[in-house]
Regions:
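A short beta-loop-alpha structural element at the N-terminal edge
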Residues: 1-15, 21-22
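Conserved GNAT-fold acetyl-CoA-binding loop/helix
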Residues: 17-35
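A short helix-loop-beta-strand connector motif used in the catalytic cores of GNAT acetyltransferases and
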Residues: 36-47, 57, 102
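Conserved acetyl-CoA-binding loop-helix of GNAT-fold acetyltransferases
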Residues: 82-98, 119, 123
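Conserved beta-strand-loop-alpha-helix junction that forms the acyl-donor binding cleft
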Residues: 97, 103-122, 135-136
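Conserved catalytic-core motifs of GNAT/GCN5-like acyltransferases
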Residues: 109, 127-142
């Protein structure tokens, strides 16, 4: 589904504790309405829903510069219901579509030590560029992830990752 403030807010209000910690450390606050209004303006993205229509995950790409997108993702505890399908959709459709639209580089950040996020980023084709020491609002370390259009062209030739969220 398209990014809509009410759907983003529903995911944000029910997001996993670890995602909430990460958002707070990034200074994005814990105000679901504010986060929803901000991400609804993202140029790229969607809401992933369960079969019953419940919003489960928000994926948003904000264009920071022409060709450079900052990627945000958070989800509810129901993510395992759609994790594999969501990963496949991102790899097969979303990421190649971003490249076709002229995105040269996507970046994302995750709390250092958030092992699930690290595994998932790798399964999507991202690579860890560096550790951002004391980057978080409370001095937490973050990993900066990158994915370039060259990486995407190479990854399309690789077998698909199968890790479910």
């Amino acid at each position: 589904m398209p990014l809509q403030p009410e759907l983003i807010a529903q995911v944000a209000y029910n997001m996993r504790a670890r995602d909430r910690d990460e958002m707070a450390a990034l200074g994005l606050g814990l105000n679901s309405s504010w986060l929803a209004e901000r991400l609804a303006l993202a140029r790229y993205g969607f809401i992933a829903c369960a079969d019953d229509g419940t919003p489960i995950a928000a994926c948003a790409g904000e264009e920071h510069l022409p060709g450079l997108v900052g990627w945000s993702f958070f989800a509810t505890a129901r993510l395992p219901e759609i994790g594999l399908a969501l990963t496949r959709h991102l790899r097969r459709i979303t990421i190649p579509t971003l490249c076709e639209a002229g995105v040269r580089r996507a970046e994302a950040r995750s709390l250092k030590g958030y092992d699930w996020a690290a595994r998932w980023m790798v399964s999507l084709g991202f690579r860890d560029l560096c550790v951002l020491k004391r980057f978080g609002a409370g001095g937490q370390d973050f990993i900066l992830w990158e994915l370039t259009d060259d990486d995407v062209r190479k990854s399309l030739l690789q077998p698909e990752a199968t890790e479910a969220a």
